[in-house]
Every structure is written in structure tokens, then in C-alpha cells.
Regions:
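Secretory/organelle targeting and membrane-embedding segments
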Residues: 1-30, 35-375
Length: 375
């Protein structure tokens, strides 16, 4: 992964031309994310790559789409009548999507300095998790039907404050800290990093999806390096009961939550209220849990294993289509341009290594009376 090479747009086209028409029909182009730097460069690269083949021969790989729990979001929704009828704005009050890492940039400083968390993680991983969580039910379980529904979600997504995006987007950068007594360097002290770098290693933002299902429901996404815990998850928080009939231990009843754990410990949790033992009617929160390993007795496949096998079999279900990628870049390009032209409007907020990120990210949710989940 060190010093990842820049994508050679003409490579696929040139090889296709060299091998002849017959072999070109069998050619597969597998593109690792992120490809391009914004909406314009992505469109240009897509035109170049398609010069050597058709869209059906291009497989844009995103490791998160190969993970069992990401795929299981569709399974839980569309195979169970208890979830899909309440998977909407009438019952869900907010959604949190998190992808946190405990490591720093490691040997990837050369790549990361020109990318940052917004391009490296938000534009692809988190956006795909959002699309799968929010997509409409496809008419059939077919690759193109599924990808079309994801594309519609991304085309309907927007920043919570498009006129003043600094009100809904927080950028951070990890500083020095400690872990089990061992000191950890800050991002600017990493080998290969500009000592005055303004590259973000953390992003948190608030989005809306302007469609019938999700109108008015905030989607909060966050990702960062050198955070307190390694995890990827989707948290759906349900609306509170309109009337509180029972006393709750510690105050008001807690909102029901469905937590989909992508990694580690792949599985799901459902949090709800029950009556506490004893006299009186007091409620307390409890959890039901599903563990992939415990239920199936084997660890799930690594994402790349499944994805590369699917590419060889020409199954595009778990790969992103060009219109999905373009919609994602269209969503974030205004932020990228703002960072480029007026970086002081989206300043870098420092945070200590092995914490949960900058205080400004907590304030983003606090304005809505919410907290980030910290497992």
C-alpha cells in the first residue's frame, strides 16, 4: 500500500487495443478507490477507461462492500417484515455511520497528504454504507436494480447546510498522544508529512436525503485515524414513544437503537426498553445481540476475496457503477473546492491520539441534542 501509484487512465485502453477485439471482451478492469480527485477528474478518468471496454467490464472495488455485514444490511431489511415497514422517517429519528481506526497513516503519508480523510474514506466507504442503508427496495435482486437504487439515494443526498457547509462539516487532525504508556506521534510528526500540513485525518458531517422515505432525517457520518477504537458500524436511532407511561431508571426511557456492526465482531444489536424486576412499573434498556461468528461458526470472508472472485465471474453486484461514483463526487466536490480555495472556512481541529476526535465534532451533534455513540 506504500506510495500507491496514480491510476494510469490510458492503461486499460492501451492493453485492450493491443490484445485484440476477442480478448477485449474478456478483459476486466478493477479500479481501487479513490480514483480521481473530484467530480471533473472522475468523469475524465471514466471516459478514458471506457475507451478500452464497456461499463460492464469495469469493477470499481470498495472493500466495505465485500464485508458480510454490509451485505447483510440488505438481508435484514428485505428478508424480514419487522424491519422494512419501519425503515423510514416516520420511525427513525437519526442515523450514524462510523468508520474509525486506531492506527495513524503508517507508511501511506505520501498518498495521504494529497488525499485526506474526505477523499480516502468519506467519498467511498462511508458513502456506500449510507447508500445501502438508505436505498429503496429494488424490484428484483439484480445487480443493476440494486445499483440503480443506490445511485438514486446519492443523487438525493445533500449537505445539511449547502450555503454554509462549515456548519455541517468538521475536519480534524490527530496530534500526539499515548497508548498503554507508549507515546504516539502527531500527524505532522509522521515521516513524509509536511510539518505544517492542513490535511484532515478526521471528518464528521451531517447530511440529508431529500426523498419520501428520509426527508428530514439527519445522517451523521464520521471517520478518523488514531481514534479510541477500531470499528465500522451503522446506528439507526428510532423515535421515542409519543407518551411515556412508565418511569425509567435514570430518567427518561432511552430511544430504541439498531446497531449494525461492520467490523470487528461482525453482527447486530437491538436496544429496547423492558420492565425492571420488582414492584412498580419502571423500565430499563436491554440488548439483543447477533454475532456472525457465533451463529455460523466461522469467520466471514475477507472483503477482497469475495470481490475479486465476483469480478472474475463478471458479477457487478458489489461494485459501484459510474453514476454512483459521479453522484458521490458531486456531493463532496463543493467541500473539496472550499478547502482548496478558502481553507480557513473549514479549519483543522486538532485532537489527541486515541481519543474520539475533536470537540467540534461532538458540538455538531450537540446542536441537535444528540451524542455520538462510543462503544
Amino acid at each position: 500500500r506504500a506510495g500507491w501509484p496514480k491510476f494510469d487512465a490510458g492503461g486499460g485502453r492501451a492493453r485492450g487495443e493491443e490484445e485484440g477485439v476477442k480478448d477485449r471482451q474478456r478483459m476486466r478492469v478493477v479500479k481501487q478507490r479513490p480514483v480521481g480527485r473530484d467530480e471533473g477528474s472522475d468523469k475524465s478518468l471514466n471516459r478514458e477507461v471506457k475507451g478500452g471496454g464497456q461499463e460492464k467490464q469495469i469493477f470499481r472495488i470498495d472493500i466495505c462492500l465485500g464485508r458480510e455485514t454490509v451485505q447483510n444490511i440488505k438481508g435484514m431489511r428485505f428478508a424480514n417484515t419487522i424491519f422494512e415497514p419501519i425503515w423510514n422517517r416516520n420511525y427513525i429519528s437519526s442515523v450514524q455511520i462510523t468508520a474509525s481506526e486506531t492506527v495513524g497513516v503508517e507508511e501511506r503519508a505520501g498518498y495521504y497528504e494529497t488525499s485526506g480523510a474526505l477523499r480516502d474514506m468519506v467519498q467511498n466507504h462511508l458513502t456506500q454504507m449510507l447508500a445501502i442503508t438508505a436505498m429503496e427496495t429494488p424490484g428484483r435482486f439484480d445487480p443493476e436494480a440494486i445499483r440503480s437504487e443506490k445511485a438514486k439515494v446519492l443523487q438525493a443526498a445533500r449537505l445539511a447546510d449547502e450555503l454554509e457547509p462549515w456548519n455541517c462539516c468538521i475536519r480534524g487532525q490527530y496530534g500526539p498522544g499515548g497508548s498503554d504508556g507508549a507515546p504516539l506521534s502527531g500527524y505532522r510528526q509522521e515521516p513524509g508529512v509536511d510539518p505544517h500540513s492542513t490535511t484532515e485525518t478526521y471528518v464528521a458531517m451531517k447530511l440529508f436525503i431529500d426523498n419520501w422515505r428520509w426527508q428530514g432525517v439527519p445522517f451523521y457520518v464520521r471517520t478518523g485515524k488514531r481514534l479510541a477504537k477500531r470499528l465500522s458500524e451503522v446506528v439507526l436511532t428510532f423515535r421515542e414513544a409519543p407518551v411515556h407511561l412508565f418511569d425509567a431508571a435514570g430518567g427518561s426511557p432511552t430511544a430504541n437503537q439498531l446497531i449494525l456492526r461492520i467490523q470487528p465482531d461482525e453482527g447486530a444489536e437491538f436496544k429496547f426498553e423492558v420492565k425492571s424486576p420488582g414492584s412498580g412499573m419502571r423500565s430499563r434498556p436491554v440488548e439483543m445481540e447477533f454475532s456472525y461468528d457465533e451463529s455460523f461458526g466461522e469467520p466471514s470472508d475477507e472483503g477482497y476475496v469475495r470481490l475479486l472472485a465476483d469480478a472474475m465471474l463478471s458479477d457487478p453486484t458489489l461494485f459501484t457503477r459510474s453514476d454512483e461514483v459521479e453522484a458521490a463526487w458531486r456531493l463532496y466536490t463543493p467541500l473539496l473546492e472550499l478547502i482548496e480555495d478558502s481553507p480557513w472556512k473549514l479549519p483543522i481541529h486538532p485532537y489527541e491520539s486515541r481519543t474520539w476526535g475533536p470537540a467540534a465534532a461532538d458540538a455538531l451533534l450537540a446542536r441537535d441534542g444528540l451524542l455520538w455513540r462510543r462503544p
